[in-house]
Curated annotation (Swiss-Prot):
GO biological process: actin modification; peptidyl-histidine methylation; positive regulation of DNA-templated transcription; positive regulation of muscle cell differentiation; positive regulation of transcription by RNA polymerase II; regulation of uterine smooth muscle contraction
Pfam families named among the record's database cross-references: Rubis-subs-bind, SET
Organism lineage string: Eukaryota, Metazoa, Chordata, Craniata, Vertebrata
Compartments reported by the entry: Cytoplasm; Nucleus
Biased composition (Polar residues): 10-20
Domain remark from Swiss-Prot or TrEMBL: The SET domain specifically recognizes and binds actin, suggesting that it does not accommodate substrates diverging from actin.
Induction: Expression is repressed by microRNAs miR-15b and miR-322, repressing muscle cell differentiation.
PANTHER family: ACTIN-HISTIDINE N-METHYLTRANSFERASE (PTHR13271:SF47), UNCHARACTERIZED PUTATIVE METHYLTRANSFERASE (PTHR13271)
Domain (SET): residue spans on this chain: 94-314
Annotated organism of origin: Mus musculus (Mouse)
Protein name as catalogued: Actin-histidine N-methyltransferase
Keywords: Actin-binding, Cytoplasm, Methyltransferase, Nucleus, Phosphoprotein, S-adenosyl-L-methionine, Transferase, Ubl conjugation
Family affiliation: Belongs to the class V-like SAM-binding methyltransferase superfamily. SETD3 actin-histidine methyltransferase family.
A GO molecular-function descriptor: actin binding
Length: 594
């Protein structure tokens, strides 16, 4: 995944001799752990906390300078070894080559014509680095004792990667040597580059990512220095923050979810070769073939010899791409911003609104999304706004009588308004809310566009400003769209136009409403509304595995850089509080601490 792989040349094949004592670092990491485990700061104090944590991290990094294990030469020097290793172990290596595409970084280029839906790439399980292979590695003894590693597959995978990188004879060395030496995730941003994200919706996730990564490093530094099962780890003599940041980013930008060998559950994996593919808009074309026990990818479209081969990572917003993958995707057809809405409990009609929403499968308070495409809202949000703006009489119509179920059934469909007045109210409310969100930014759209013309702007600052600009453009578009809809329905109200009524024969219309949803509404994929890919239900995932006719696991959540299972939170920044306590207790308690 070259776009998130802008690299600096790696310089040495071994770790340098330590110039700082483990005890000194242990004292600093204890201070860092205490700072990162403090209660969340009050609103307006997040930046202050971030800079304090960053100062401690930078102090540790300075003392550890030169201690990390790296490799001689450039990343691309190892590509031939990767291809040879992949070929010898059953992966496909014909029809493509690894090339530097400049702005997009390294990716795959077709060396022959490839037809759409043609199977062109497969990687057998033995080549994958997984949580399962971590358990069977030198990390196994510590994994068996540490509840945090057991509860968080992404962290286990990061340590697996670090241990194998530090082992010259590792089976995965041909793969690890081709990984970037650094990334463009916010963990690598300079303070001024992070400052470009201030006032954006993404900044809170950036703060959380940085804080949690620092907390995890501090916790595991103590574990590695003091836990008896860590004695044989190749990290014992040198485990730097730089190492951990690299491993976390490598996993965060590349991880994917695959079924275990028996297909009964899912596990996290790094997939060599395939993870070189860059992203474009489209559909998921990668799955897992249980019969042949390999990851398979079919072509997203026709590719001619010389074309870059793209895959689709999933319906990610640009905030997700920047934070978890380290790149901004121009013309992202799935870009969106979050909007938090809820019915106030002080609302006189709260009980009735809550009941209508419950029947539609919608919570009284949630995070929805405003989309970059038309319409800017989904069926879920439309239904919520309609209920939010209902009069007492309209609420009664949705709760009582023979037609109540039909009214619930059509709540999220644009073809069947509750009333013209209700439509005017909801679009007016949305227009006002989006306008207020726009006013929270410290710069205007025009100012951001001017800044982006600066040729001296760093790659990461450019990403940050593009993200900031993109959020505002989506909000501005939502304001304009809401205004148009408001006037459209106001005209209908003034003209006393008859309301369309639902009949069973109209069922086909329900698939073409806002968000192209099938109603009645159920609480589905609110993570998409929030712009966050939430945890896949384990049972849901397993059922997908078993139901796949050809043994492929494929779908929106089975994508690089962000699939989840119940027991495996994908991105380290999403973990909550790591404490300095010894690893013990139930898995549930560990998850609460993390």
């Amino acid at each position: 995944m070259g776009k998130k792989s802008r690299v600096k040349t790696q310089k040495s094949g071994t770790g340098a001799t330590a110039t700082v004592s483990p005890k000194e670092i242990l004292n600093l990491t204890s201070e860092l752990l205490q700072k990162c485990s403090s209660p969340a700061p009050s609103p307006g104090k997040e930046w202050e906390e971030y800079t304090q944590i960053r100062a401690l991290v930078e102090k540790i990094r300075k003392k550890q300078k030169g201690l990390s294990v790296t490799f001689d030469g450039k990343r691309e020097d190892y590509f031939p070894d990767l291809m040879k290793w992949a070929s010898e172990n059953g992966a496909s290596v014909e029809g493509f080559e690894m090339v530097n595409f400049k702005e997009e970084g390294f990716g795959l280029r077709a060396t022959r014509d490839i037809k759409a839906e043609e199977l062109f790439l497969w990687v057998p399980r033995k080549l994958l680095m997984t949580v399962e292979s971590a358990k069977n590695s030198v990390l196994g003894p510590l994994y068996s004792q540490d509840r945090i590693l057991q509860a968080m597959g992404n962290i286990a995978l990061a340590f697996h990667l670090l241990c194998e990188r530090a082992s010259p004879n590792s089976f995965w060395q041909p793969y690890i040597q081709t990984l970037p030496s650094e990334y463009d995730t916010p963990l690598y941003f300079e303070e001024e580059e992070v400052r470009c994200l201030q006032s954006t919706q993404a900044i809170h996730d950036v703060f959380s990512q940085y804080k949690n990564t620092a907390r995890q490093y501090a916790y595991f530094y103590k574990v590695i220095q003091t836990h008896p099962h860590a004695n044989k780890l190749p990290l014992k003599e040198s485990f730097t923050y730089e190492d951990y940041r690299w491993a976390v980013s490598s996993v965060m930008t590349r991880q994917n979810q695959i079924p275990t060998e028996d297909g009964s559950r899912v596990t996290l994996a790094l997939i060599p070769l395939w993870d070189m593919c860059n992203h474009t808009n489209g559909l998921i074309t990668t799955g897992y073939n249980l019969e042949d026990d390999r990851c398979e990818c079919v072509a997203l479209q026709d590719f001619q010899a010389g074309d870059q081969i793209y895959i689709f990572y999933g319906t990610r917003s640009n905030a997700e791409f920047v934070i978890h993958s380290g790149f901004f995707f121009d013309n992202n057809s799935h870009d969106r911003v979050k909007i938090k809405l809820g019915v106030s409990k002080s609302d006189r009609l709260y009980a009735m609104k809550a009941e209508v929403l419950a029947r539609a499968g919608i919570p009284t308070s949630s995070v929805f999304a405003l989309h970059s495409t038309e319409p800017p809202i989904s069926a879920q949000l439309l239904a919520f706004l309609r209920v939010f703006c209902m009069t007492e009489e309209e609420l009664k119509e949705h709760l009582l009588g023979d037609s109540a179920i039909d009214r619930i059934f059509t709540l999220g469909n644009a073809e069947f308004p509750v009333s013209w007045d209700n439509e005017v109210k909801l679009w007016t409310f949305l227009e006002d809310r989006a306008s207020l969100l726009l006013k929270t930014y410290k710069t205007t759209i025009e100012e951001d566009k001017i800044v982006l013309k600066n040729p001296d702007l760093s790659v990461r600052a450019t990403m940050a400003i593009k993200l900031r600009l993109g959020e505002k453009e989506i909000l501005e578009k939502a304001v304009k769209s809401a205004a148009v809809n408001r006037e459209y329905y106001r005209k209908h109200m003034e003209e006393r136009a008859p309301l369309p009524r639902y009949e069973e024969s109209d069922l086909g219309l329900l698939e073409g409403g806002v968000g192209d949803s099938r109603l009645p509404l159920v609480l589905r994929k609110l993570e998409e509304e929030a712009g966050v890919q939430e945890s896949l239900s384990l049972t849901e995932t397993v059922s997908k595995v078993k139901a796949a006719e050809n043994g492929l696991v494929n779908g929106e959540n089975l994508i690089p850089n962000g699939t989840r299972s119940e027991n495996e939170s994908l991105s380290p920044e999403e973990s909550e509080n790591v404490t300095g306590e010894e690893s013990s207790g139930s898995m549930a308690k560990v998850k609460e601490r993390l």
